[in-house]
Amino acid sequence: MAIEYLGLSSVEGPLVVLEGVQDAFYDEIVEFVVDHKTKKMGRIVELNEDKAIIQVFEGTENMSLDNTHTRLMGRPMEVTVSPEMLGRTFNGIGQPIDDMGPLISEDKRDVNGLPLNPVRREYPRNYIQTGISAIDGLTTLIRGQKLPIFSGNGLPHDQLAAQIVKQASLGGDSDEDFAIVFGAMGVKHDVADFFRKTFDENGVSDHVCMFLNLANDPVVERLITPKVALTVAEYLAFECNMHILVILTDMTSFAEALREVSSSRGEIPSRKGYPGYLYSELATIYERAGIVEGANGSVTQLPILTMPNDDITHPIPDLTGYITEGQIVLDRNLYGQSVYPPINVLPSLSRLMKDGIGEGYTRDDHQALANQLFASYAKVGEARNLASVIGEDELSPLDKKYLEFGREFEQRYIGQGTTENRTIQETLDLGWELLALLPRDELDRIDTKLIDFYYPKKNEA
């Protein structure tokens, strides 16, 4: 039964305080009626005896202390779910904003999700093809994995996210259902329009469910957007048996919104002013990826965050790295050389890659080829350091070959067009083509049988 109160005790930023509350519970949804006409929604974020602190999703502008009616709804925040959500666009709390009418469904789910029994989790296997060689070949995205992209201000992470949405698939041989849930937090209007236009023009909107929290939307809404997106993803994966890729951008906006709300509540700050529970808040989002026993679907996460001042030790990427299973790092130097996508493969890592590639998944040479490309590209750095001291002309013939390999690797393997969609076979074949620039005896990370089979014959001659 809903309980209604008249008046508020105080309004502080995105928060309101209500006293004399009875039978309320944490995370309970609240409805406000301001001046008998404007409706707003919120949720209880703190209870202290008979006092409740409530986050207001639409902001606290025009809320009167005397003439605001507050109704406790007696339930946690829920989002309406349906397979018909694919092809639709919603705001940060799951309300349609695409002029296609309301969502007709009686199914609702708690946005906090249900805890997954660890015993029922299945180990992530198989891969998701993004069509981008630096990811598919060297930091392969595995179904059920959480693999963040570490970017920086001004780097093309929005273009990369849009390209992945356009190209992502389960591979050429799979006939399983695949869809994408896209959540954007704190994005500008032009960026939101870019995503909409890109998805529409490339004909992928029908299998994308998009949640948009714009830069001028209430800060509090940013804290809900990833939870709403993941709730829909879990429904599609575990109840509709679909493989879902969740792309969340920008998790830095989420963390900054958390810091702002924490400051409004007067909490003691931790590192860089962020609350001490930033780690647990990030974990409640990232840990919702996975595969559940008995369900044919999976939830794979590809969160994107911008590192303040390109600092990978900043609390947001630092704590993210503790929770997730690797990272893909975008590099400003590569971007300055017009390499797109500017993925620095050496600090990038996919910890679950070994379990979803190779024979039966991609190709038997995949792991060894990736190891050799990593090792050879690392030697490129050594050769460049030596050339900066003694000059390129004084290098040995082998070092010059490594410099040539490095240039070709960055321009042809890492670099590719925004519309270029490579299959996993094309990515692996390109890797062998580039390794052919090096002498065969330099390929010390690959078994001889694989070299005999895949190493280009013309190079041996």
Q: Each predicted region: which residue ranges?
A:
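P-loop NTPase catalytic core
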Residues: G137-E460
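Acidic-enriched and Gly/Ser
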Residues: M1-Y5, S10-T130
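Short glycine/serine/threonine-biased micro-segments
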Residues: V11, F90-G92, Q129, I135, ...
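P-loop NTPase nucleotide-binding/switch module
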Residues: T68-T70, M77, E84, P96-K146, ...
